[in-house]
């Protein structure tokens, strides 16, 4: 299948990183909902095709640009959510908790600008600001984006309450802060299908300064933090639970 021409600049990011020619990419997929994303990942896993997750390409490190031939998954199509009990719909991409108006569910394919525009009439805002308002929320979570406000308000990690993660074989995980916690350096996660994933966290000490190298790993950690900043190597996000602040 020829590569998509939907987003012709999508083989280069904001840092002008360019690796393969468009012709070397087997296929570009732009899923529009979770079911399509699950099927795309499941097929790629079955056929052992390399996958690159692509957002708005506002990054400067080339992480959204395919390094080798394979499948590009364009996440800009995941810009809406289904209804959820206990949440009221504000926008196709935003649901606000009825019990706690400072909590909400957000689609990964929505931009930072669109999210804060939707929150403004509610007298709410989302503090993380990586310096590019076109950046997608999913990309912010995948990179644990920070920026000029991080000294006062912290990085993206501080505002993530839940994640719905699609693993590379199509398995779905629902992660909630405070519920899914490691036992020392060991973890166990139950997938939506009932499969249990168990193992050991990386055995290294993270520096107590700003650091973007490797997966976040600490004893007794919230396992949601393993996926925040993982840059797509563990899975894709189909739904993101955020904490907001009052204006």
Listing of model-derived features with the role each one plays in the protein:
Residues 1-49, 56-103, 153, 239-246:
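N-terminal flexible segment immediately upstream of the FAD-binding catalytic core
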Residues 28, 52, 104, 134, ...:
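Residue-level marker of motif borders
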Residues 80-87, 94, 108, 112-113, ...:
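FAD-binding subdomain of flavoenzyme oxidoreductases
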């Amino acid at each position: 299948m020829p590569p998509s021409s939907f987003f012709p600049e999508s083989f280069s990011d904001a840092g002008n990183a360019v690796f393969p020619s468009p012709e070397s990419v087997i296929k570009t997929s732009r899923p529009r909902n979770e079911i399509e994303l699950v099927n795309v990942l499941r097929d790629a896993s079955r056929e052992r095709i390399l996958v690159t997750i692509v957002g708005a390409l506002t990054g400067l490190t080339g992480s959204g640009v395919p390094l080798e031939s394979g499948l590009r998954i364009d996440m800009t199509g995941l810009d809406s959510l289904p209804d959820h009990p206990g949440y009221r719909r504000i926008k196709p991409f935003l649901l606000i908790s009825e019990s706690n108006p400072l909590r909400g569910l957000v689609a990964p394919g929505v931009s930072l600008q669109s999210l804060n525009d939707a929150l403004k009439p509610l007298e709410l805002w989302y503090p993380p600001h990586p310096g590019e308002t076109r950046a997608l929320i999913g990309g912010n979570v995948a990179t644990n984006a920070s920026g000029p406000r991080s000294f006062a308000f912290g990085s993206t990690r501080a505002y993530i309450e839940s994640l719905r993660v699609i693993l590379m074989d199509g398995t779905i995980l629902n992660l909630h802060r405070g519920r899914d916690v490691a036992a020392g350096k060991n973890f166990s996660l139950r997938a939506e299908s009932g499969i249990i994933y168990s193992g050991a966290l990386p055995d290294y000490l993270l520096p107590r300064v700003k650091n973007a190298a490797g997966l976040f790993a600490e004893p007794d950690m919230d396992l949601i933090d393993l996926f925040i900043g993982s840059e797509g190597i563990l899975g894709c996000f189909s739904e993101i639970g955020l904490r907001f602040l009052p204006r």
